[in-house]
Amino acid sequence: MSELAVILGLSGPKLTVSERAFFRDANPWGFILFSRNIENPEQVKRLTDSLRETVGRNCLIFVDQEGGRVQRLRQPHWRRYPSGAIFQDLYAQSEAMGIRAAYLSYRLIADDLRAVGITANCAPVLDLPRKNADPIISDRAFGTQSVQVIDIAHAVMAGLMNGGVAPVIKHIPGHGRAKVDSHKALPKISVTRQTLERTDFIPFRALSDAPMAMTAHAVYECNSRTAITLSKKSLTCLLYTSPSPRD
């Protein structure tokens, strides 16, 4: 993947004439679908086929299908999946049960995605939420302790990959301390590098063999005054070299 590679979205449930021409010319690395692009299984499959036909190759097509609040493929056409907090609760009762439940849930998600031509899922979430942080992560997380997050996230990755879907770990190097929603404002995380090394960074290092990672759109002031989405220095502080889509 080139440093200049891009993943593009589109305006609605089917390709417009102008989008088709633009995508053919731009030849993006992949595409991402949002709720505005999704109506029913037959429509999504036609759309993913059209996108690949437009660029002339079997490109990756991404979606955010975590379960809970973040689920682009929804009822009544698709199953409703639990949030990350459910696996956290199950893990507290029995580690094996929490891990197995996460695997099975994401294995089913993989089947749903592959059936409509989606081949990459922006999951699992590896962030460690803090009590004073914005609730944008909250129940999407697998826990507040790195050990359980790592265990559950490994199961999630296995479920997706065994179903033929590429996982995208997120939000590297940790969004759990952000005090604002990064979709609305730019969070600035001001704790020391040493603190991050002992906490937020741990899950991302443990899963650094993931095929892809999505960056957090935040400033980590111990490394740079620039948002990590634009800062190679901040990204390399984790020594993470896999492709990294920007959030």
Predicted regions and their residues:
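Acidic (Asp/Glu)-rich catalytic clusters
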Residues: 22-25, 54-55, 207-208
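Short, well-ordered coil/turn segments that N-cap beta-strands
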Residues: 2-4, 57-59, 118-119, 163-165, ...
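Short, acidic/polar
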Residues: 13-22, 106-109
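Acidic, His- and aromatic-enriched active-site or binding-groove loops in soluble protein domains
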Residues: 140-159, 187-201
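Boundary/entry segment of secreted carbohydrate-active catalytic domains
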Residues: 1-14
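Enzymes and membrane/adaptor proteins characterized by extended Gly/Ser/Thr/Asp/Glu-rich
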Residues: 27-48, 54-148, 177-189, 216-225, ...
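Charged helix-capping and loop-helix junction motifs
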Residues: 227-236
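Conserved small/polar residues in nucleotide/adenosyl-binding loops
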Residues: 240-247
